Structures are given as structure tokens and as C-alpha cells.
Amino acid sequence: MTHFDFHVHTALSACADNLLSPGRIVRKARETGVDFVAVTDHNASAHAAVAVRLAADCGLHILPGMEVNSREEVHLLALFSELEALEDFQALIDSVLPVGENPTGFFGPQVIYDERDEIVAMDERMRQMGVSLGLDVLVEEIRGRGGYAVPAHVYRSRNSLTSQLGFVPEAAGYAALDFAARTWRSEGLAAGQRVHGYPATTGSDSHFLEDVGRHFCTISRSVGTVHELFGALAEVAP
């Protein structure tokens, strides 16, 4: 059996708790028994490498990731197996972000921590807004780097496929669809179940430490890599 959460924010996301360091997330995830955690900050990834280093010796698998905001204002989880692929994707995102500094008084600070839970910097780029690349292009860029593109909180009333496009595109290259916890429970969904032709997943969308490990997805098979994990999701019967 494998427990995973593809959607966890750190203090690098302006909308998250400023105390949400990678170290605190790693420790909380281990306490709650989650096996895979994806660090997915808004258009940012500075904490992914820190989390990977901290988790290396404790049996927790960290997926380097990001929640990128497309030109259409659709939130898309970009998940990778290697830090280098995420770093290359980050360079692309930095080149297509809106120009300007983060309005801290409006969005909140974007805090960068080290391995000792100490604040070392503030990210001053404006990262909450949509980038200039469309959803289809972003999916291609993620897949071209060996990553997995997963539209986030698909049925949510904002920043989702259904809120921004009005539908879920078929055969669009998505590795899975992410559903918010409330939708997951109300619809009675299960990991890998086909919805709109894609495997269903769910995650905590944690913005506070107490949310880490509160809601996650489970498959019956034990897997050791992100490729095996997505393979297992894809093999679930429709």
C-alpha cells in the first residue's frame, strides 16, 4: 500500500502559512505515514531541493514540483522525478512570469527556509499571477522534461479547468486529475478511477502545517518511484 499527496504548499507560496518550512513538512508527513509528498508552490520551487535533502534519510519520497498558473488562470501541478528537470522548468517559468515585485501587503510574503527551519531569504518576484504560456503549452513543456501534468482541484469554482474553460479537455496529455478533498469525499472517488478519461487523484492542498497528512490518496500497491506510482494509477480499471 502507498499513501501519497501530490499537492503541498510551503511558506514560499504567498498564500501559505509563513511557518510552513520544508523541514516541518517532512517531519509532519512522516508522522502521518505518507510515503510520497509533492512540494508544489505557486510558480516557484526553491524549497524542493531542501525537502529532497531532508527526506533522503527518513524513507519519505519527495516529488519536486510546482503549481503553475497558466495564461488562462488554470492551476496545473507539474511533478517531476528529478530536481534538474524541475530547475529547468523553473527557468522557463521565470522567463514568462509577469513583470513586477510581489505585493507583500496584498498577497503575503514568499519565505525561503533552509534545512534548519531558519529563514534565509524572501522571494520578491510576483508569483501568484498567471504566466504568459497557455495550458496546452505548459503541458507539453512538463511532459518534454519527463514530468507529469495534473490539473489541480478540477471542479473548484476558481483557477480550475471547469471554472476557466468550462470543460475538461479530452486527450490533452494530463497524467491525472486532482480533486479537492471535499469533492473527493462527496463524489465517492477512488485513486485511479477514470473521470473524464483520466485517473483521479486527490491531495491536501496544504497551506498550514496541520493540513499536512490530513488528506491524501492511497493505492493498494507498494511502489518506490514516481514513475511506478503513475503507472499504478494508470493501470486501475476504468
Question: Which ranges hold each PLM region?
Answer:
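Conserved Rossmann-like nucleotide-binding pocket used by diverse enzymes
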Residues: 38
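Surface-exposed cleft-lining segments at the edges of enzyme active sites
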Residues: 118-130
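Charged catalytic cores and adjacent phosphate/nucleic-acid-binding surfaces used
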Residues: 1-6, 10-34, 45-91, 110, ...
